[in-house]
């Protein structure tokens, strides 16, 4: 309903795709569904749910199935950060975090894969992060490791299902101007990031969607972050 996810929705609608949107904020979903539908002349439906609820992926699938929606493109984008140090964060919060960023991605992909296999056509995007290539951080202890796992999971989908016309793209943006940092309580840190390292959600979405339709397994948007990731891969973590 905001940030990269909203811009991906706009990009797909501009390509003529009908959309099923999901997020927690029903009021936002109502307004943006109307805006996108009127602007791009496509059908937009939505279901409000919280992916920290283990039942949400099945609820999303049932919603689409009951309405006979055929999902050709699956965007796994939900995410947030945890500001508190790992040792101070309640385990319940860590479990919710893992469900939103990890388990729900696996569940949604697993649930929608069979119909893609049947049609021998499907595009999947998993919104990961440049943090997946970075050394461990003193804060956000789980964020980078989960994103690294998501990259590997995306690779696994490609290895197992490319021959059936299904591809998965891990989109790995760097700092992006969205509500993410405010919602995660780390806006102060974002404000200190140099402007040349910050990019618009619209640009990130465009590069990601282009890469997804091109069947690329991974997309690191902008030359700035391509160079950074090359350096992260080239040098040992001990000297970074």
Regions found by a protein language model. Give the residues of each.
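C-terminal helical subdomain
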Residues: 170, 191-228
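Conserved glycine-rich Rossmann-like NAD(P)H-binding loop of the short-chain dehydrogenase/reductase
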Residues: 15-31
């Amino acid at each position: 309903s905001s940030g990269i996810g909203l811009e991906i929705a706009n990009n797909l609608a501009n390509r003529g795709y009908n959309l099923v949107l999901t997020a927690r904020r029903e009021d936002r979903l109502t307004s943006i569904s109307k805006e996108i539908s009127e602007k791009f002349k496509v059908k937009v439906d939505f279901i409000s749910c919280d992916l920290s609820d283990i039942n949400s992926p099945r609820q999303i699938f049932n919603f689409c199935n009951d309405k006979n929606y055929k999902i050709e493109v699956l965007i796994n984008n939900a995410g947030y950060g945890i500001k508190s140090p790992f040792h101070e964060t309640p385990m319940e919060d860590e479990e919710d975090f893992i469900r939103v960023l990890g388990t729900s991605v696996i569940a949604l992909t697993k649930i929608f894969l069979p119909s893609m296999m049947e049609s021998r056509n499907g595009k999947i995007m998993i919104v990961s992060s440049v943090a997946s290539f970075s050394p461990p951080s003193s804060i956000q202890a789980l964020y980078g490791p989960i994103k690294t796992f998501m990259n590997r999971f995306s690779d696994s989908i490609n290895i197992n299902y490319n021959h059936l016309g299904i591809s998965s793209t891990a989109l790995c943006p760097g700092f992006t101007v969205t509500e993410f940092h405010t919602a995660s309580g780390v806006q102060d840190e974002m404000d200190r990031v140099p402007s040349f390292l910050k990019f618009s959600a619209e640009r990130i979405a465009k590069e990601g969607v282009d890469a997804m339709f091109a069947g690329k397994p991974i997309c690191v948007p902008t030359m700035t972050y391509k160079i950074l990731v090359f350096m992260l891969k080239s040098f040992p973590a001990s000297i970074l």
